[in-house]
UniProtKB/Swiss-Prot annotation:
This is RAC-alpha serine/threonine-protein kinase. It comes from Homo sapiens (Human). Its EC number is 2.7.11.1. Changing residue 20 to R: Slight increase of phosphorylation at T-308 and S-473. Changing residue 305 to Y: Abolishes phosphorylation at Thr-308. It is found in: Cytoplasm; Nucleus; Cell membrane; Mitochondrion intermembrane space. Glycans are attached at residues 126, 129, 305, 312, 473. Changing residue 176 to F: Significant loss of interaction with TNK2. Loss of membrane localization. Significant reduction in phosphorylation on Ser-473. The modification Phosphoserine is found at residues 124, 126, 129, 473, 477. There is a cross-link at residue 284 (Glycyl lysine isopeptide (Lys-Gly) (interchain with G-Cter in ubiquitin)). Binding of the PH domain to phosphatidylinositol 3,4,5-trisphosphate (PI(3,4,5)P3) following phosphatidylinositol 3-kinase alpha (PIK3CA) activity results in its targeting to the plasma membrane. PI(3,4,5)P3 is also required for phosphorylation at Thr-308 and subsequent activation. The PH domain mediates interaction with TNK2 and Tyr-176 is also essential for this interaction. The AGC-kinase C-terminal mediates interaction with THEM4. The modification Phosphothreonine is found at residues 308, 448, 450, 479. 1D-myo-inositol 1,3,4,5-tetrakisphosphate binds at residues 14-19, 23-25, 53, 86. The gene is AKT1.
Length: 480
């Protein structure tokens, strides 16, 4: 699709993702799937070109509801393995019908276009053994993976759409994080959701500092993603133990994070959105692994206001809090927060009261310990600029701007990617099955968190749901 055109535009009320209030936003829906909102109606093309959020209606699921307000509609899609939702309402049922029809039409058009491209790449629509099959599954599973092949050790996270469990593969003794999403969340009762392209993006993502997908499969009611679980321990654990990292150590971790985010932004067109200390782990050699175990936490409530938040408020960028639609620069704010924690031993902004915390994030100037060097101060000041357009990395150069900052002078970025830099700390683990950095409580004994149902075996084909997810199984065994 060479020419990107606006399919529909107009005012919508958008519900805040974190502070659940409704705000008027002027939205543009384009035929390439882009769906972006502005505080005010953009008057000219230049304003429209400003980098905004990367929300796409490709492979989305649309739902209509009369709650919490009449004429509400929800757009839901999988970004990576995380369910992303946006909630809108309009004044009349007719208006809602116009918007949902336009969005569905764009989504269907993109799906058709992609299917045609897939047919073209595979040479023949009917030949399933060709390039298409290779594209979808790098190494076809020798057998169907099932839930029975894992021991279930610990609940790592639980949310509205599913859960993440630390599992051990019985055959190899290796540890993985299994993200289990409820299928009905993604397959609406009346329609088929298109999760497979997103699944393919994940399968084809290869970066040394991103958690790799090992398997994905389905049961009668769940989609399961089995991802690497690095056993060098959480960075949070190591930082709590040492209180603060040297600038050199922080530079090493920061460089690996920048390399991974650069890949997501430039190669995959994905904004990670969820960079925080808990999502950073070390592998057995001491290199960074950014995890994708995220689930929207349920019911994080602030007693004073009873507004519900999704995620960790301390890490939220100002533009996310204000619900200005946002782009790649949110990830550089997240980088600023985690690097500040590493070098200063505390969060840049903190208050137990969420309202006060948000005020600090939006208004408070950043302060540094006297011990911090000038390059580190300059880097953190740049990354923690309130205005995303002024932020380091907020321009069109994105990650390149950060790579060229003097804090990273002397870093050869190709060497970072190739893991040629020597990690400043090597975890004391002997192999990928060494559990010394795991909590003792769950390595000492196996606990069954999710006993697999009898019909969770892949051999049981659920005739009603199954056709919606053709080829939803994947194994990276060929690359392990």
């Amino acid at each position: 699709m060479s020419d990107v055109a606006i399919v529909k535009e107009g005012w919508l009320h958008k519900r805040g993702e974190y502070i659940k209030t409704w705000r008027p936003r002027y939205f543009l829906l384009k035929n390439d799937g882009t769906f972006i909102g502005y505080k005010e109606r953009p008057q000219d093309v230049d304003q429209r070109e400003a980098p905004l959020n990367n929300f796409s209606v490709a492979q989305c699921q649309l739902m209509k509801t009369e709650r919490p307000r009449p004429n509400t509609f929800i757009i839901r899609c999988l970004q990576w393995t995380t369910v992303i939702e946006r909630t809108f309402h309009v004044e009349t049922p007719e208006e809602r019908e116009e918007w949902t029809t336009a969005i569905q039409t764009v989504a269907d058009g993109l799906k058709k276009q992609e299917e045609e491209e897939m047919d073209f790449r595979s040479g023949s629509p009917s030949d399933n053994s060709g390039a298409e099959e290779m594209e979808v599954s790098l190494a076809k599973p020798k057998h169907r993976v099932t839930m029975n092949e894992f021991e279930y050790l610990k609940l790592l996270g639980k949310g509205t759409f599913g859960k993440v469990i630390l599992v051990k593969e019985k055959a190899t003794g290796r540890y993985y994080a299994m993200k289990i999403l409820k299928k009905e969340v993604i397959v609406a009762k009346d329609e088929v959701a298109h999760t497979l392209t997103e699944n393919r993006v994940l399968q084809n993502s290869r970066h040394p500092f991103l958690t790799a997908l090992k398997y994905s499969f389905q049961t009668h009611d769940r989609l399961c993603f089995v991802m690497e679980y690095a056993n060098g321990g959480e960075l949070f654990f190591h930082l709590s133990r040492e209180r603060v990292f040297s600038e050199d150590r922080a530079r090493f971790y920061g460089a690996e994070i920048v390399s991974a985010l650069d890949y997501l932004h430039s190669e995959k067109n994905v904004v990670y959105r969820d960079l925080k200390l808990e999502n950073l782990m070390l592998d057995k050699d001491g290199h960074i692994k950014i995890t994708d175990f995220g689930l929207c936490k349920e019911g994080i409530k602030d007693g004073a206001t009873m507004k519900t938040f999704c995620g960790t408020p301390e890490y939220l960028a100002p533009e996310v809090l204000e619900d200005n639609d946002y782009g790649r620069a949110v990830d550089w704010w997240g980088l600023g927060v985690v690097m500040y924690e590493m070098m200063c031993g505390r969060l840049p902004f903190y208050n137990q009261d969420h309202e006060k915390l948000f005020e600090l994030i939006l208004m408070e100037e950043i302060r540094f310990p006297r011990t911090l060097g000038p390059e580190a101060k300059s880097l953190l000041s740049g990354l923690l600029k309130k205005d995303p357009k002024q932020r380091l990395g907020g321009g069109s150069e994105d990650a390149k701007e950060i790579m060229q900052h003097r804090f990273f002078a002397g870093i050869v970025w190709q060497h970072v990617y190739e893991k040629k830099l020597s990690p400043p700390f090597k975890p004391q683990v002997t192999s990928e099955t060494d559990t010394r950095y795991f909590d003792e409580e769950f390595t000492a004994q196996m606990i069954t968190i999710t006993p697999p149902d009898q019909d969770d075996s892949m051999e049981c084909v659920d005739s009603e749901r199954r056709p919606h997810f053709p080829q939803f199984s994947y194994s990276a065994s060929g690359t392990a």
